[in-house]
């Protein structure tokens, strides 16, 4: 599932392509919105909120969430028609939403109601680290990975950053949140990670952008830990796959 930084720069790409332009075509391929046609409306704002995208045009707001496989593409690209959920065109460009997990057309005045449940947005103007830290610490018995992935705690952490944060703070993904010494440091580090990667596709949490050296543990099962050399372990039995170093990460 895309992380908050991916959605942030997807929004930036859509903003550059569509903002300030008049829609000449709007084809929403969702039965509920099949009759919606925003042709003639001007796209005047594109924004992200956590992992959610909003394209505002006229009195409407197109709300999408990429979920596991979704993407937005700019320009003419070859995609199987059955995968296309929406087509937006202007006089000089085209944006298509592919395999979007959520796609709905909302009233612009109330579109933020769809994301009112989210915690502080790691890449948003409303980022409040102390609120996020309090949210994280609210249930000390909760497994750390589960809490980090809960968008009500803070919006934008996906499975990559979840696993990387667990490693950086030396805790197993299953360790209770209450074992963290300083939840504020954890949410601040989460913010730093996403902020540094918000404008690039070559994500890194190690600070090394060279191929194969960008991440600490995620996707590295069976490879040596970058700190101690122990082989990275993985568990695919849960809802989300987890990765950890059995030496550098502990339960308490």
Curated annotation (Swiss-Prot):
State the free-text cofactor note: Binds 1 zinc ion per subunit.
**What effect does gene inactivation have here?**
Greatly increased sensitivity to trioxsalen (also called trimethlypsoralen, it intercalates into DNA and forms interstrand adducts and cross-links after UVA exposure). No change in sensitivity to other DNA damaging agents cisplatin, mitomycin C, UV light or methyl methanesulfonate.
Per the record's keyword annotation, is Zinc included, yes or no?
yes
Annotated Gene Ontology MF terms? Answer: class I DNA-(apurinic or apyrimidinic site) endonuclease activity; damaged DNA binding; endonuclease activity; oxidized pyrimidine nucleobase lesion DNA N-glycosylase activity; zinc ion binding
Catalytic activity reported: 2'-deoxyribonucleotide-(2'-deoxyribose 5'-phosphate)-2'-deoxyribonucleotide-DNA = a 3'-end 2'-deoxyribonucleotide-(2,3-dehydro-2,3-deoxyribose 5'-phosphate)-DNA + a 5'-end 5'-phospho-2'-deoxyribonucleoside-DNA + H(+)
Q: Which sites are catalytic?
A: 2 (schiff-base intermediate with dna), 3 (proton donor), 51 (proton donor (in beta-elimination))
Q: What is the effect of changing residue 51 to A?
A: Loss of lyase activity on an abasic site, partially rescues trioxsalen sensitivity of a deletion mutant, loss of glycosylase activity on 5-OH-U
Cofactor(s) recorded for this entry are: Zn(2+)
User: Which CDD domains would you find in this protein's record?
Assistant: AcNei2_N
Q: Which residues bind Zn(2+)?
A: 225, 228, 245, 248
Q: What EC number(s) has UniProt assigned to this enzyme?
A: 3.2.2.-, 4.2.99.18
The biological processes this protein is annotated with in GO are: base-excision repair
Q: Which SUPFAM superfamilies match?
A: Glucocorticoid receptor-like (DNA-binding domain) (SSF57716), N-terminal domain of MutM-like DNA repair proteins (SSF81624), S13-like H2TH domain (SSF46946)
Which InterPro entries does the record match to this protein? DNA_glyclase/AP_lyase_DNA-bd, DNA_glyclase_Znf_dom_DNA_BS, Endonuc_Nei2, FPG_cat, MutM-like_N-ter, Nei2_N, Ribosomal_uS13-like_H2TH, Znf_DNA_glyclase/AP_lyase
Arranged from A to Z, the UniProt key words for this protein are: DNA damage, DNA repair, DNA-binding, Glycosidase, Hydrolase, Lyase, Metal-binding, Multifunctional enzyme, Zinc, Zinc-finger
Per the record, the zinc finger regions (FPG-type) lie at 216-250
The entry assigns this protein to a family as follows: Belongs to the FPG family.
* Assembly information from the UniProt record: Monomer.
What this chain does, per the record?
Involved in base excision repair of DNA damaged by oxidation or by mutagenic agents. Acts as DNA glycosylase that recognizes and removes damaged bases.
Q: What NCBIfam families would the database entry show?
A: endonuc_Nei2
What protein is this chain from?
Answer: DNA-(apurinic or apyrimidinic site) lyase Nei2
> Whose protein is this, by species?
Mycolicibacterium smegmatis (strain ATCC 700084 / mc(2)155) (Mycobacterium smegmatis)
């Amino acid at each position: 599932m895309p992380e908050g930084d991916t959605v942030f720069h997807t929004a930036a790409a859509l903003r550059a392509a569509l903002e300030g332009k008049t829609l000449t075509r709007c084809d929403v391929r969702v039965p509920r919105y099949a009759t919606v046609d925003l042709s003639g409306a001007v796209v005047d704002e594109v924004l992200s909120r956590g992992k959610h995208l909003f394209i505002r045009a006229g009195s409407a707001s197109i709300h999408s969430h990429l979920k596991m496989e979704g993407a937005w593409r700019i320009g003419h690209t070859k995609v199987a028609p059955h995968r296309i959920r929406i087509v937006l065109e202007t006089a000089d460009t085209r944006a298509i939403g592919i395999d979007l997990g959520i796609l709905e057309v909302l009233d612009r005045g109330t579109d933020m109601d769809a994301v009112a449940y989210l915690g502080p947005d790691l890449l948003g103007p409303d980022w409040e680290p102390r609120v996020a830290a309090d949210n994280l610490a609210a249930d000390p018995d909760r497994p750390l990975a589960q809490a980090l992935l809960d968008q009500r705690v803070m919006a934008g952490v996906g499975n990559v950053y979840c696993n990387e944060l667990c490693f950086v703070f030396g805790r197993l993904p299953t360790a209770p949140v209450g074992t963290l010494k300083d939840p504020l440091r954890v949410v601040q580090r989460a913010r730093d990670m996403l902020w540094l990667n918000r404008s690039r596709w070559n994500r890194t949490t190690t600070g090394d952008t060279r191929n194969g050296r960008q991440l600490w543990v995620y996707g590295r099962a069976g490879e040596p830990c970058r700190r101690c050399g122990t082989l990275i372990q993985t568990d695919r039995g849960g809802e989300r796959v987890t990765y950890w170093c059995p030496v550098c990460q502990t339960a308490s």
